[in-house]
A protein has these predicted regions:
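Substrate-binding/active-site clefts of carbohydrate-active enzymes
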Residues: 3-9, 14-49, 56-173, 178, ...
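Hydrophobic faces of well-ordered beta-strands that scaffold small-molecule active sites
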Residues: 9-12, 51-53, 96-98, 184, ...
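Active-site beta-loop-alpha junctions enriched in small/polar residues
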Residues: 16, 56, 101-103, 189-191, ...
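Short, glycine/acidic-rich beta->alpha junctions
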Residues: 35, 77-81, 192-196, 293-297
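Active-site-proximal helices and loops of the catalytic beta/alpha 8
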Residues: 92, 116, 177, 187-271
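Active-site groove signature of glycoside hydrolases
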Residues: 102-104, 153, 167-194, 272-281
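Active-site-proximal substrate-binding groove within the catalytic cores of carbohydrate-active enzymes
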Residues: 263-304
Length: 304
């Protein structure tokens, strides 16, 4: 458990949307990410002390299709722009958690482009899970590969390849050293080989013992991922659902049951964890659109 997370009040921003970026990659670089600096007084007014930023790495479309792990998306600005934002946030006492998408990359990822060009002769063929030149795929590449949930624009990485692991760890080290980020939210954590998380945890602990690792987990036993050997925390989707549905149905047993099951003094199964509790995010509807009665908003935020 990282001590700072016990009192962390998070604000979540999806930068590509927040900054009004174009839908697709642009060659021209625009310093939109600096807009976050303007919001620092607003964050301080709400006593926010941790900012979770959705994808900032270079991508072709929505950010979860990474094309370069070591470069800020042109639509957001330059690495220097983002460093300026990070410095301002830290000066204001706000920690920074970035979205780390390590299960898959986009089709414009540099190593995958090399495979598309050189095919079997590419030195990066083993970087991608179950790459097979004996079959075609819906994109008509003349080969196939594993994806995230059947989306062929999201190419699954081979995290059992040491070269891939080293590349990712070195990329993470760059963001830790140059931008002093405080943690990572790990996308699609339930799809990732647990051995990678063990390596990641060891690497981060040695690099910065205060660095926080939080995984996106929707179903299952959270202890499977959040434990001393792997991640520090996971998303608490169980209580997220209970927070709004208990109010909508005027039946508070659901949230009471979840809280007691998770954190109750007599055997709460997650009582030793600090889970990432939330009322909405980029994958679900906004809370104000989910609750049936506007007056319940204040109650839900208070319970959070």
């Amino acid at each position: 458990m990282k001590s700072w997370t016990k009192d962390a009040v998070f604000y979540h921003i999806y930068p590509l949307g927040f900054c009004g970026c174009e839908q697709f990659h642009q060659e021209q670089q625009t310093s939109r990410i600096l807009k976050i600096k303007e919001w620092i007084p607003h964050l301080q007014k709400m006593h926010i002390n941790a900012l979770y930023l959705g994808p900032v790495f270079e991508s072709y479309e929505h950010g979860y299709d990474t094309s370069d792990y070591r470069k800020v998306d042109n639509r957001l600005g330059s690495n220097a722009d983002f460093r300026e934002v990070c410095d301002a946030l830290h000066k204001a006492g706000i920690r920074i958690v970035l979205d780390g998408v390590f299960n898959h990359v986009g089709r414009y990822f540099w190593a995958f482009r090399d495979v598309m060009e050189k095919r079997e002769q590419s030195p990066y063929c083993n970087w991608f899970h179950n790459l097979n030149f004996q079959w075609d795929n819906p994109m008509h590449d003349g080969f196939t590969y594993d994806t995230w949930e059947g989306h062929y624009n999201l190419v699954k990485l081979n995290l059992q390849n040491e070269e891939v692991v080293q590349y990712l760890l070195e990329s993470i080290a760059m963001w830790m050293d140059d931008f002093h980020i405080d943690g990572l939210r790990l996308d699609a954590a339930d799809c990732i080989d647990p051995a990678f998380f063990r390596r990641l945890k060891q690497f981060c602990e040695e690099h910065n013992p205060d660095f926080w690792l939080m995984g996106e987990i929707i179903h299952g036993d959270y202890n499977r991922w959040a434990n001393p050997d792997m991640l520090d925390s996971v998303t608490n989707y169980e209580c997220y659902k209970g927070l709004y549905s208990s109010h909508n149905e005027k039946n508070y047993f659901e949230i009471a049951y979840s809280l007691n099951r998770q954190f109750g003094g007599n055997g709460g199964i997650y009582k030793d964890l600090v889970l990432y509790d939330f009322v909405d995010n980029h994958d679900v509807n906004r809370l104000a659109s989910t609750v049936k009665e506007e007056r319940d908003l204040a109650n839900i935020y208070t319970m959070l």
